[in-house]
């Protein structure tokens, strides 16, 4: 199975968080772009993007949306919890004879056995194994892109550091653990870059990041940007967190708190959130300096002052 040129791409999940940047860079590179969506009527997409209705119930219901349209590649950027839909989409892509898939490999790496055994990963493993098995049989080719954290999302939603001041930042294992994060725009750029080099990127996994940052570093910038804000912290030991998470899980408590604590342990406590080596250069991604990260934090804090900011009198 070989393909020297990819020009016609379909996106599953193109109306979600990664959609705008992915569509932007694919169009910029001159590719024909279509988007699968469950709700074509309400999809708000650029005029030069084809919108295709999709039923993700099964591969059989989804395949007709892909067949006969000449797609060379499919980019799967469905909701990070839509694991069943990801497997369905991959099978439908095989049924339609699509050459290349970029599956949803954007989160943490599964290389560490302890992490792979965590409950939140057990739903991701079937997706990964399914892709690898299909590639092994020559049914499809793939390219994986591991991005670490989505930079915009973890800053917007107070996930990495509580920039809004609404709740304390949960500082993991001292707060000096380096973490890789990639801006949504750079993820779109990387996806487009991969598809422009189909032969070089066949059945490979790449690592990229826009910035490497620590919680203490970002907290420091935030405090500098808003000296009157509290930016409270809660120190957490990820080993203690994961022990409690396993206890809850084994007692049948499968709540968001448990999932969150497993993720925190995997990302911070086990160093799995930092990529010591990346493929930035190959993908055309430029890593930010500390000064650029500081400017980004200042911009965000100034635009949305923390709720507990004390306004100077006078």
Describe the function of each predicted region:
Residues 239-314:
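A hydrophobic C-terminal alpha-helical subdomain
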Residues 63, 184-192, 290-298:
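Short, amphipathic alpha-helical "lid/cap" segments that border enzyme active or binding sites
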Residues 102-110:
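Short, glycine-/small-residue-enriched flexible loop/hinge segments at domain edges that mediate gating
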Residues 68-103, 115, 119, 123-130:
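NAD(P)-cofactor binding segment of oxidoreductase domains
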Residues 2-47, 57-60, 96, 109-230, ...:
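Oxidoreductase cofactor-interface core, primarily capturing Rossmann-like NAD(P)-dependent enzymes
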Residues 105, 231-242:
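A generic structural motif
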Residues 50-72:
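Conserved Rossmann-fold cofactor-binding substructure of NAD(P)-dependent oxidoreductases
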């Amino acid at each position: 199975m070989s393909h020297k040129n990819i020009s016609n791409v379909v996106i599953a999940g193109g109306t979600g968080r990664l959609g705008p940047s992915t569509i932007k860079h694919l169009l910029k590179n001159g590719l024909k772009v279509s988007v699968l969506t469950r709700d074509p009527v309400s999809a708000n997409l650029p005029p030069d993007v084809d919108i295709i209705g999709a039923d993700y119930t099964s591969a059989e219901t989804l395949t007709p949306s892909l067949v006969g349209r000449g797609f060379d590649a499919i980019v799967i950027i469905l909701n990070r919890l839509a694991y069943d839909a990801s497997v369905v989409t991959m099978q439908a892509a095989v049924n339609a004879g699509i050459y290349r898939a970029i599956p949803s490999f954007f989160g943490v790496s599964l290389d560490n056995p302890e992490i792979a055994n965590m409950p939140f990963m057990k739903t991701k493993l079937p997706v990964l194994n399914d892709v690898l098995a299909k590639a092994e049989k020559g049914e499809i080719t793939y390219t994986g892109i591991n991005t670490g954290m989505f930079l915009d999302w973890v800053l917007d939603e107070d996930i990495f550091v509580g920039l809004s001041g609404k709740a304390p930042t949960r500082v993991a294992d001292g707060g000096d653990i380096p973490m890789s994060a990639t801006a949504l725009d750079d993820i779109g750029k990387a996806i487009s870059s991969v598809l422009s080099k189909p032969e070089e990127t066949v059945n490979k996994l790449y690592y990229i990041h826009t910035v490497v940052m620590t919680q203490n570093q970002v907290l420091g910038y935030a405090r500098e940007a808003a000296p009157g804000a509290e930016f409270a912290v809660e120190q957490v030991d990820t080993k203690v967190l994961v022990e409690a998470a396993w206890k809850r899980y084994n007692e049948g408590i499968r709540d968001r708190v448990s999932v969150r604590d497993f993720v925190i342990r995997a990302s911070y406590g086990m160093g799995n959130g930092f990529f010591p080596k990346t493929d930035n250069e190959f993908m055309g991604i430029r890593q930010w300096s500390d000064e650029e990260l500081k400017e980004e934090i200042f911009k965000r804090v100034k635009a949305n002052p923390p709720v507990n900011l004390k306004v100077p009198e006078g």
